[in-house]
Amino acid sequence: MSFFNLDRFRFQRDNAVGIHRKSPDGSNSDKENKQAHQRKADGQFPSGKTSRQVLEDVSSDDEVVRMGKDSASDLQQHINKDMEDKIIKLLEIFPQKSKKDLLEVIENTSTLDGAVAHCLMIYGDEDSGGRKDKGGRSDDDDQPKKKRKIQRSDSSESEDEDSEDEESEEPSREKQEALLKKLKRKLPDIEKEVLRDILKEHDWDYENALGSLLVFSSTDTSSPENQKSKQKSKSSHSKEKTDKITQRPSGSSSLSRWLTAASSHVPEVSSMSALKTQKSALSKSTSKNSSFKRKRGDEMPLNDVSASEDEDEIDSDVDSMSDDQDSEDEDSISGTLQDKIIQFLQDASLDELALISGCSIKKAQKIISLRPFNTWKDVKEQFFKDNGLSIDLVHGCKVVLKERQVVLDLMGRCEKIAQKMTKDVTQVIEAGMGSIKQPKVLNSNLKLQAYQLIGLKWLILLHQHKLSGILADEMGLGKTIQAIAFLAHLYEKGIKGPHLITVPSSTLDNWVRELGLWCPSLKVLIYYGSVEDRKYLRQDILTGLIDFNIIVSTYNLTIGNDHDRSLFRKLKLKYAVFDEGHMLKNMNSLRYRHLMTINAEHRLLLTGTPLQNNLLELMSLLNFIMPSMFSSSTSQISKMFSTRSSEEESSFHKDRIAQARLIMKPFILRRVKSEVLKELPPKMEKIEMCPMSDAQHKLYDILFKRLKKTPNGDKRELCNVMMQLRKMANHPLLHRQYYTSDKLAAMSKAMLKEPTHYDADPALIQEDMEVMSDFELHNLCREYSSISGFQLEKALILDSGKFALLTKTLAKLKEKGDRVVLFSQFTMMLDIVEILLKHLDHQYVRLDGSTPMAERIGLIDKYNTNPEIFVFLLSTRAGGQGINLASANTVILHDIDCNPFNDKQAEDRCHRMGQTRTVQVIKLISKDSIEDCMLRVGQEKLKLEQDMTTDEGEDGAITEQMAELLKVSLGL
């Protein structure tokens, strides 16, 4: 933290009162926060020691005056009506303190606000505890609402402070965010980055940071008495202030000197405006060194709405929403705001009510049960009654409404940009090819399709407006080629990079190949390899030893560790291209936050997955491609729309979804194959209902009845139930049925004959075996000769309803000369399918998540060039993206995915450009099983075009939403 920032709230004193403190050279902020030893002018210590350091308000008209014993006569002259008014006010706020204590505080401060801040710092922890004890008293209502709320919040603050002291280290990220939000609620007019810096300067001590800010803004008008006090004291202190300014030590910060000079020239300026001015200066200084800030001028040239105008727009309707603790009573709420609160309480959904601070689900349900709220009187009657609801909830509505206003304002700004773009984009789409030509640096032997040229022109148009975008063409329409053509166009125009292309691991080789094939002029660097290899690569990149235009890397390596992330923060990129951009739909994910730090002027997202009707995901994508627009408001967006309501969405949510989709229209280009590829052969889908074998059916029924008896309140447990049923529906060997406990006991004893296990404990061996499936135990028996006699018979391995149908289907397809791509969710299922294919004497190749990257492109080429290979086995997640297998014309989905769009991606490995035959998609569904229910739910989701992608989920992961739907379907 720069000393420029630290000096902002550092205690300073004129030469008459010395402060003995170490120079702020070290980073130990604990030492800075310790009490400063003070001496009077004669060198003696004062008798009354202060428990905390008093902070000076350099921007206010009143200076802090410490009075010693030898100035007692002067003190008597100052005890007048103003001081009595101050004591009365302080007694109202701190009734548990004696008049003597409060008088001492007033003597040590010159303003009422300064005295309040001083009391909060000294007595805050004591007061909060006392206030909690008084919560049940009826006379508590006699206290001002403002003060009660402050005391209650101080309680939680003291708990946070205590926990930090115990840890004696920087708090966790979650705790930091919580403290930041709490401070933001107290001071909504100050930017978060400024508040974060101040918290850091105070070692994340909330109370000290708040006290510093309160003292700094002590001239904020909170009461008429304070105004009178200011007017009376201004003249008496003006001369003293001038003297102190001239005597200020030269070692004070430039910011402090500037503020002091400014306050002397403009005595009437309010402290909040001074604070805003200082905040602006501080923001400018910190933003210069911040690698996370985007270049606003480069990123958003169309955004001609100034930040100050935006703030005025937000504040015009919601000035009274600003969480001002000085107006925490019902009389202070304006008529317009009352109407908005009534409307919110009347229309908000359960989840939206739960966003109110202190509003639990039970309270939200209570509010809904008390509807309708037609007038402000209705609200006051219900929230003042002794029915478990507090008037604080009504004031909490103001915060939620303000956050809504932030979102509305952001979307309004985006809409202005969208309107300017829509006309140009429409002209490009309607004009068709026109004068659009393929870049000359592209391979002359390869030609772009007409719709690909339109996509290229659209990308060029975005670039001319200095905007980012999302190319969302359906899978198989050549998004990769369009992106390469665009980078080639930039190369022709003299923009030679560097660019970054981030892709899934399975498509890395394909991207490198397509770049070399379509545009050999581009110099491509593959950022890949071990930690040591990447270390030397980074050095060569940063020192300029390697000449390149494009870096191609994977998601895992781009943000793999601190050094990888540091490289792409330091490297000034022109374009960052993200393949499979739907991975960036959640702004709360760690991957999203890391990728946001990549230092690129523009971003281009490629995705074949349609956008979900989920506002958080839409806003996440908007935020990613236009970070300068959203950087300061992501927390409000995330909070407002991260919850998924089980009930019908509110009208506010629906309206924002409609608005977001309208805004995103010019930034997203999506075409489907049926529209642009008239010559592409059709795709036929066939669902094969496979009756389970007799043994499999019995085992499934036993498992279903057992799972149905178990408690299913926990959604995670419910997801596990679904997974167990899915595994049994696919193959019995995915569970442990045939290897009984007695058989495992015999096997564990036999294992002692192995040289590797001669001194092992049979009980521990058996314990390890009990968690394995039948097929895993079968493979174990094949590995160790001592237990080879326990192997399963081949008839048991092939005993599956799907295998019976698959045997017949493969024979027919092979006879017709068709070639097959077979997908499964489970790699273990692929292991069992391999045994079936060997048994049926079918040639095959296999690719899954464990296949080394270097071998993947070779396997794809081997299958595409060798027609003798009949089947390509693929795991749905690893092989379902970015792979071209147009040489096959039949797709078999052995087991369907929870997300139907993953299956659609898998199907499009064959149904894509270059396909000359009708593509047949066969889905194998176990009859009367969990898969039957999954199919119905998936079909409904496809109709709604709602993608159920789980962020960084494991293979076969089931979303909670899917689990709930299946729970109803199965009657669990």
Swiss-Prot record:
A Gene Ontology biological process term: positive regulation of transcription by RNA polymerase II
Domain called CUE: residue spans: 82-127, 175-218
GO molecular function: ATP binding; ATP hydrolysis activity; ATP-dependent chromatin remodeler activity; chromatin binding; DNA binding; helicase activity; nucleosome array spacer activity; ubiquitin binding
UniProt KW ATP-binding keyword: yes
Low complexity biased stretches: 279-290
SMART domains according to UniProt: DEXDc, HELICc
Polar residues composition bias: residue spans: 247-263
Entry GO terms, CC: chromatin; nucleus; site of double-strand break
EC number: 3.6.4.12
Family: Belongs to the SNF2/RAD54 helicase family.
Function as written in the Swiss-Prot or TrEMBL entry: DNA helicase that possesses intrinsic ATP-dependent nucleosome-remodeling activity and is both required for DNA repair and heterochromatin organization. Promotes DNA end resection of double-strand breaks (DSBs) following DNA damage: probably acts by weakening histone DNA interactions in nucleosomes flanking DSBs. Required for the restoration of heterochromatin organization after replication.
Listed name of the protein: SWI/SNF-related matrix-associated actin-dependent regulator of chromatin subfamily A containing DEAD/H box 1A
UniProt gene name: smarcad1a
